[in-house]
């Protein structure tokens, strides 16, 4: 999507999360959950020049979203944007670069010709946020780590031209997995991760006549099945009267 408002997903899952937001006046990196070298490689594979990134937007301080932030930001001389609690939390793990800008949920700001609005999500990391991006009379919404879709998230994510939403696990596969019971309970909690059913049940409310594309993200390699999710998504989307016709698990 180089040259127009859009998003290129570099990777999404427990091993790392990152995406490039293309704006009218530049590009932003959303999360930096891979090493700096891996981020650069993934960008170059998609014909994105890493030197064109003008800032890094962080959703929360878990390593799979932030571990490459310091090296990439310092190497390319760009700031990281994150909330004050996340800054404090991530600084302890030495994930942050020299240049940092504090942002606040509910307070929109302008970058690269994009109106960026962070909003709070219910997740078990300190001060987790999602984002909406507005430009060219379109809205992109991203929410990839949340235990449930609360009223605020539903309000912010409704009517996106492109929606990137978590579909982390299939509950039956999670329960059969060898994961510790404490981890299973955390994932299933209201501050854990969305299941396939959780995500798909929300689409009737979130997708409107303005919705063009959906990306189902943060799939568990161990506790989800891409073919199953694809089938579930296609069946759900046939019921909806919107322009959306594509589901792409990552």
Question: Language-model features: where?
Answer:
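Active-site metal-binding motif and surrounding structural segment of the metallo-beta-lactamase
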Residues: 36-82
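Conserved beta-strand hairpin/beta-sheet module of binuclear metal-dependent hydrolase folds
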Residues: 1-46, 129-144, 162
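Cap/insert and terminal regions of metallo-dependent hydrolase folds
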Residues: 151-248
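Active-site environment of divalent metal-dependent phosphoester hydrolases
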Residues: 62-66, 87-90, 125-126, 148-151, ...
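Active-site neighborhood of phospho(di)ester-bond hydrolases with catalytic His/Asp-centered motifs
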Residues: 30-33, 53-61, 81-84, 141-144, ...
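Metallo-beta-lactamase
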Residues: 83-130, 134-137
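Metal-dependent catalytic neighborhoods of phosphoester/phosphodiester hydrolases
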Residues: 67-76, 89-93, 224-231
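Active-site metal-binding loops of divalent metal-dependent hydrolases
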Residues: 11-12, 32-34, 61, 121-124, ...
């Amino acid at each position: 999507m180089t040259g127009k408002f859009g998003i290129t997903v570099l990777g999404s899952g427990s091993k790392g999360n990152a995406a490039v937001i293309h704006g009218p006046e530049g590009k932003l990196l959303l999360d930096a959950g891979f090493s700096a070298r891996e981020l650069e490689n993934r960008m170059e594979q998609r014909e994105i020049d890493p030197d064109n990134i003008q800032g890094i937007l962080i959703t929360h301080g878990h390593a799979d979203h932030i571990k490459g932030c310091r090296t990439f930001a310092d190497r390319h001389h760009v700031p990281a944007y994150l909330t004050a609690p996340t800054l404090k939390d991530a600084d302890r793990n030495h994930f942050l670069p020299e240049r940092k800008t504090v942002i606040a949920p509910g307070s929109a700001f302008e970058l690269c010709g994009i109106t960026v609005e962070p909003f709070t999500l219910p997740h078990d990391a300190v001060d987790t946020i999602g984002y909406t991006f507005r430009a060219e009379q379109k809205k992109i919404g991203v929410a990839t780590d949340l235990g449930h879709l609360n009223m605020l998230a539903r309000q912010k994510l409704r009517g996106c031209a492109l929606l990137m939403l978590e579909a982390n696990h299939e509950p039956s596969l999670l329960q059969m997995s060898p994961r510790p019971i404490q981890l299973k309970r955390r994932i299933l909690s209201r501050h854990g991760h969305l299941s396939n059913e959780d995500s798909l049940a929300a689409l009737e409310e979130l997708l409107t006549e303005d919705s063009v594309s959906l990306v189902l993200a943060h799939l568990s390699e161990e506790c989800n099945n891409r073919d199953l999710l694809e089938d579930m998504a296609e069946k759900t989307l046939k019921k909806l009267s919107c322009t959306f016709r594509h589901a792409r698990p990552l």
